[in-house]
């Protein structure tokens, strides 16, 4: 996918990895970048606008845990303004296994609901033009960080959902791929709670191992967007971008 002159919606585009990715996207010259985030950050939006004045950067407050109907209303506003949207990035995520329901609601259900909502505008069975979805999942969807099993399971669920979306592309016209960052130096990983406090030092222990910067992750994210491979499972770890070949242990046969 060519980012230049495209219209992109980025859910949680002002977070750690999100903000650096928004910067890299803006540098690539889309026509519009619409940022949806729970917390307003006027300084960050102003920075993105200044980074490339030719790009129209717009912000809307959005909590991924709202009902699908509310998301559809917001998306209608955006589609009425832009007419077309080429790419949806679902990037909302929290890491706190003390908040079980919210972790699942943000990391998994929010991704499902936002995706479901945009299908009203994209699904070719409804006369839509199709589109592309990039879901930010995690390497913990491959192998869990067992001290945070709720977070890891939520990301595994998001990965499975994304893989299914890709296989439905011939029906819906909507393609999808997953972005799976490794341990990245963000506020998210500097301090977080393990499930039932099984390992109070889990954040500290993780950061003792090699990590990557948000900029490294963002630059590889943009490469994945440009590659635009339906069904791709991208691993963004230690400054590298690698396509993962998923081992099939079972097939439904349908």
Swiss-Prot record:
**NAD recorded as keyword:** yes
Q: Which residues bind substrate?
A: 138
User: What InterPro entries does the database record attribute to this sequence?
Assistant: ADH_Drosophila-type, NAD(P)-bd_dom_sf, Sc_DH/Rdtase_CS, SDR_fam
Q: Does the keyword Oxidoreductase apply?
A: yes
Give TM segment ranges.
none
Keywords from the UniProt entry = NAD, Oxidoreductase
Q: How does it assemble?
A: Homodimer.
Molecular function as annotated in GO: alcohol dehydrogenase (NAD+) activity
GO CC annotations on file:
cytoplasm
Q: Which reaction does it catalyse?
A: a primary alcohol + NAD(+) = an aldehyde + NADH + H(+); a secondary alcohol + NAD(+) = a ketone + NADH + H(+)
Q: Which residues form a coiled coil?
A: none
**Which BP terms does GO give this entry?**
alcohol metabolic process
By what name is this protein known?
Alcohol dehydrogenase
Pfam families in the cross-refs = adh_short (PF00106)
Q: Where does NAD(+) bind?
A: 10-33
Known EC number: 1.1.1.1
Name the family the entry cites. Answer: Belongs to the short-chain dehydrogenases/reductases (SDR) family.
Catalytic center residues: 151 (proton acceptor)
């Amino acid at each position: 996918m060519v980012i230049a002159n495209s219209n992109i919606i980025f859910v949680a585009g002002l977070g750690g990895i999100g903000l650096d990715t928004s910067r890299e996207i803006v540098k690539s010259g889309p026509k519009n970048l619409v940022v949806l985030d729970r917390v307003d950050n006027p300084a960050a939006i102003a920075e993105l606008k200044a980074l490339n004045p030719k790009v129209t950067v717009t912000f809307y407050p959005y909590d991924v845990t709202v009902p699908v109907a509310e998301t559809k209303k917001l998306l209608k506003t955006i589609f009425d303004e832009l007419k077309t949207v080429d790419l949806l990035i679902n990037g909302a995520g929290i890491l706190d296994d003390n908040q079980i329901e919210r972790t699942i609601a943000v990391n998994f259900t929010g991704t499902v609901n936002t995706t479901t909502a945009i299908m009203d505008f994209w699904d070719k069975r409804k006369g839509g033009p199709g589109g592309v979805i990039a879901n930010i999942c995690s390497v913990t969807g491959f192998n869990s960080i067992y001290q945070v099993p709720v977070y890891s399971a939520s990301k595994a669920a998001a990965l499975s959902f994304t893989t299914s979306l890709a296989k439905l592309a011939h029906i819906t016209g909507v393609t999808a791929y997953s972005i799976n960052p490794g341990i990245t130096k963000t506020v998210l990983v500097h301090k977080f709670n393990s499930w039932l406090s099984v390992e109070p030092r889990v954040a500290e222990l993780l950061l003792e191992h090699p990590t990557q910067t948000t900029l490294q992750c963002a630059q590889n994210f943009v490469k994945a967007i440009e590659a635009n491979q339906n069904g791709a499972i991208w691993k963004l770890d230690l400054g590298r971008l690698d396509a993962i070949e998923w081992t099939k242990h079972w097939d439904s046969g349908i």
